[in-house]
Amino acid sequence: CTIPLARGRSRSANVEATLEEAKKAIAGGAKEIVLTGVNIGDFGTAHNETLLDLIQKLDELEGIERYRISSIEPNLLTNEIISFVSTSNHFMPHFHIPLQSGSDDILKGMRRRYRTDLYRERIESIKSAMPHACIGVDVIVGFPGETNEHFNETVEFLKDLDVSYLHVFTYSERENTTALRIEDVVPMEAAFDVNGGVPIEVTPAPTPPSFTEPPVVPSETP
């Protein structure tokens, strides 16, 4: 991936500054705020803060209907974040979690900081806490060294996940990335053919009313 080369060292604002930006948006009439960034799960590390700290404070603000967390790496999506979202007042039960491949061999080649067992655990944790949650998944096909067997691993892995939608991308070369040194490059024509033929059925996303209205927090059993 070329993003780390382009962005440099991960950095972010602190909780206080982000809260002020949110307050300005709310004062301007915003109904929904999406938390986004190149690596949002890494928020606050330079300030000894965490993404959990931020979303807890944001949830306390008045005047906003809903928040949504954008793409977050599975190794940075903690059980604490999942648990908080499941009981929050304003955070939507919506997660977009990049997978990229359902093959541990390919994930290793991509230098991803997670494997399929962790990814599966995150999906199961979300669905256990929020059965109605909408979960999106990123997938890359045609990564150097990917074989038909690797691709089929991804297909079977996805078939077994309770997710709502897929973003499927065809691998393309980027200058100065380590992937350029990997042999067995998948021909672009083959990668495009695979991309257009991913035979996956996923769980339909929630209907618009439940997806855009403020979340309902389950009441505790007396």
What are these regions (language model features)?
Residues 127-134, 156-199, 222:
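Auxiliary Fe-S-binding modules of radical SAM enzymes
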Residues 1-16:
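Canonical Radical SAM [4Fe-4S] cluster-binding loop centered on the CxxxCxxC motif
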Residues 195-222:
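N-terminal low-complexity segments that are often proline-rich with Ser/Thr-Pro
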Residues 21:
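S-adenosyl-L-methionine-dependent methyltransferase catalytic core, i.e., the SAM/SAH-binding region
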Residues 9-10, 42-44, 104-109, 175-182:
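A short acidic, helix-capping loop that chelates divalent metal ions and anchors anionic groups
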Residues 27-151:
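Conserved SAM/AdoMet-binding glycine-rich loop
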Residues 2-5, 29, 76, 138, ...:
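Conserved functional loop/turn residues at catalytic and ligand-binding sites
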